[in-house]
Curated annotation (Swiss-Prot):
This is Putative nucleoside diphosphate kinase. GO terms for cellular component: extracellular exosome; nucleus. The active site is at residue 103. It catalyses: a 2'-deoxyribonucleoside 5'-diphosphate + ATP = a 2'-deoxyribonucleoside 5'-triphosphate + ADP; a ribonucleoside 5'-diphosphate + ATP = a ribonucleoside 5'-triphosphate + ADP. Belongs to the NDK family. It comes from Homo sapiens. InterPro entries: NDK-like_dom, NDK-like_dom_sf, Nucleoside_diP_kinase, Nucleoside_diP_kinase_AS. Major role in the synthesis of nucleoside triphosphates other than ATP. The ATP gamma phosphate is transferred to the NDP beta phosphate via a ping-pong mechanism, using a phosphorylated active-site intermediate. The lineage of its organism: Eukaryota, Metazoa, Chordata, Craniata, Vertebrata. Keywords: ATP-binding, Kinase, Magnesium, Metal-binding, Nucleotide metabolism, Nucleotide-binding, Transferase. GO terms for molecular function: ATP binding; metal ion binding; nucleoside diphosphate kinase activity. Its cofactor is Mg(2+). GO terms for biological process: CTP biosynthetic process; GTP biosynthetic process; regulation of apoptotic process; UTP biosynthetic process.
Length: 137
């Protein structure tokens, strides 16, 4: 959020044909971050991750579309921006692994869990994009 890249990131997902179904701008509490990143709690970088993520607001988004988790991970690039190719979000906008600006779920199961931490089911908007028939068979 602090980098002023929200619009550019949204644009990339929309251009790919994905559909934004929920979005919130909110603070990331330490409690929520510890729950969200619970699988990393024993890693040495965990305290720094929580501190960094707690330093300002975040924009939480839910995207839908064919293979959105898998394709989204490719669009994000590698966790370490130095290993990310140009054209990926991290390859274009990041320089340090601890400040890689964006999180993407690593599986559908993780996505479902992470979505439930931030959104109620009724907050996910179901609609048909006017571009749907141009993107999908």
């Amino acid at each position: 959020m602090q980098c002023g890249l929200v619009g550019k990131i949204i644009k990339r997902f929309e251009q790919k044909g994905f559909r934004l179904v929920a979005m919130k701008f909110l603070p990331a509490s330490e409690e929520h971050l510890k729950q969200h990143y619970i699988d990393l709690k024993d890693r040495p970088f965990f305290p720094g991750l929580v501190k960094y993520m707690n330093s300002g607001p975040v924009v939480a988004m839910v995207w839908e579309g064919l293979n959105v988790v898998k394709t989204g991970r490719v669009m994000l690039g590698e966790t370490n921006p130095a290993d990310s190719k140009p054209g990926t979000i991290r390859g274009d906008f990041c320089i340090q692994v601890g400040r890689n600006i964006i999180h993407g779920s690593d599986s559908v199961k993780s996505a479902e869990k992470e979505i439930s931490l931030r959104f109620k089911p009724e907050e996910l908007v179901d609609y048909k994009s006017c571009a749907h028939d141009w993107v999908y068979e």
